[in-house]
């Protein structure tokens, strides 16, 4: 979900201390030459588990994984801090899961979002003005968590981009959701025009990051800007309507908690037991917020139905 999160996307560097280490580079080169050519490559493929082949793990990937741990062991033996590799901490692979804890947390976030989607559909009549917009937001959110799960399962150039792009789509769609709720019901033409602008903005954002080298700094700055707009808009509306709609505390609490929990990312410590890091903790901590946010969406939709129903009742003089 994370519709208000400013720090939803953190830029990563393309190179880190670990993968710049000559020991690591030499290890990968030797491993590649000795194991990833000719009959040895055939032996590797014959011994490689099916689930590893299906998820795209290559001989070179296996060399990098083994050399990463070889380098880490040397660092620890000599009393140095654990280094990062390619912008990430070293994680202990489980089956084909590259980052098991983050993958599990992303999956659970997706399940929570999907369950709340079903609950919203079962408790809110389709005649509600915000019904389709809320369902669309829910599906965008589920899709984002799906790609987050895939990315943490197997980090490739494609899965990384899909994770970033889908996360951006959640923030932008949350802005549209807020626009619909604050202006769109009274002025549909404004909401339609703004929605078209957001689609164009999203297309330009993706094009810039896809056509050239992926600009992590721009990506972080752009999504931070999207997040600030989203955050301030929702908070302003909640503060303005707080005396008329008492359930808005749920929306405010989600906003505040998401921003507070994002601070976990700043801890950035080596994974505990080589599995659980700050990023995974952040993802785990957002799971309960789905229930609170969708409770707000349900209450707000039912409130709109009640207001419209009361307006339709003829007044007796």
UniProtKB/Swiss-Prot annotation:
Cellular location(s): Golgi apparatus membrane
Lipid bilayer topology: Multi-pass membrane protein
Keyword Hydrolase recorded: yes
Any Pfam family: Per1
EC numbers, comma separated: 3.1.1.-
MF GO annotations: hydrolase activity, acting on ester bonds
Segments in the Lumenal topological domain: 19-93, 154-163, 211-219, 273
Gene Ontology biological process terms, A to Z: GPI anchor biosynthetic process; GPI anchor metabolic process
InterPro entries reported for this sequence: Per1-like (IPR007217)
A single GO cellular-component term on record: Golgi membrane
Keyword hit for Membrane: yes
Cytoplasmic side of membrane: 115-132, 181-189, 241-251, 294-317
Known glycosylation sites: 35
Signal peptide, first to last residue: 1-18
Keywords: Glycoprotein, Golgi apparatus, GPI-anchor biosynthesis, Hydrolase, Membrane, Signal, Transmembrane, Transmembrane helix
Membrane-spanning segments: 94-114, 133-153, 164-180, 190-210, 220-240, 252-272, 274-293
Function (record text): Involved in the fatty acid remodeling steps of GPI-anchor maturation where the unsaturated acyl chain at sn-2 of inositol phosphate is replaced by a saturated stearoyl chain. May catalyze the first step of the fatty acid remodeling, by removing the unsaturated acyl chain at sn-2 of inositol phosphate, generating a lyso-GPI intermediate. The fatty acid remodeling steps is critical for the integration of GPI-APs into lipid rafts.
PANTHER family assigned: PER1-RELATED, POST-GPI ATTACHMENT TO PROTEINS FACTOR 3
Family the entry assigns: Belongs to the PGAP3 family.
Protein name (database record): GPI-specific phospholipase A2-like PGAP3
Originating species: Xenopus laevis (African clawed frog)
């Amino acid at each position: 979900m994370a519709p208000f999160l400013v720090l939803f996307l953190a830029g990563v560097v393309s190179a880190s201390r670990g993968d710049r280490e000559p020991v690591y580079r030499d290890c990968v080169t030797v491993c590649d030459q000795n194991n990833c050519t000719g009959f040895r490559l055939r032996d590797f493929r014959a011994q490689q588990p099916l689930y590893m082949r299906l998820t795209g793990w290559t001989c070179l990937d296996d060399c990098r994984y083994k050399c990463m741990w070889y380098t880490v062991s040397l660092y620890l033996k000599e009393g140095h801090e654990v280094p990062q590799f390619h912008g990430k901490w070293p994680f202990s692979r489980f089956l084909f899961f590259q980052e098991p804890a983050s993958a599990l947390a992303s999956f659970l976030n997706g399940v929570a979002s999907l369950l709340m989607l079903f609950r919203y559909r079962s408790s809110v009549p389709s005649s509600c003005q915000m019904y389709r917009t809320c369902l669309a937001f829910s599906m965008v959110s589920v899709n984002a968590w799906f790609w987050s799960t895939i990315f943490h399962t197997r980090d490739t150039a494609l899965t990384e981009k899909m994770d970033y792009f889908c996360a951006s789509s959640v923030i932008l769609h949350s802005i549209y959701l807020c626009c619909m709720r604050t202006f769109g019901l009274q002025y549909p033409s404004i909401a339609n025009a703004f929605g078209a602008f957001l689609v164009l903005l999203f297309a330009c954002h993706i094009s810039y990051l896809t056509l050239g080298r992926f600009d992590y700094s721009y990506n972080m700055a752009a999504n931070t800007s999207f997040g600030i707009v989203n955050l301030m808009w929702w908070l302003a509306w909640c503060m303005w309507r707080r005396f008329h709609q008492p359930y808005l505390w749920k929306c405010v609490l989600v906003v505040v908690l998401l921003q507070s929990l994002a601070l976990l990312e700043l801890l950035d410590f080596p994974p505990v037991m080589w599995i659980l890091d700050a990023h995974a903790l952040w993802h785990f901590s957002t799971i309960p917020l789905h229930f609170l946010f969708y409770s707000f969406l349900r209450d707000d939709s039912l409130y709109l139905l009640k207001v419209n129903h009361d307006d339709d009742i003829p007044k007796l003089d």
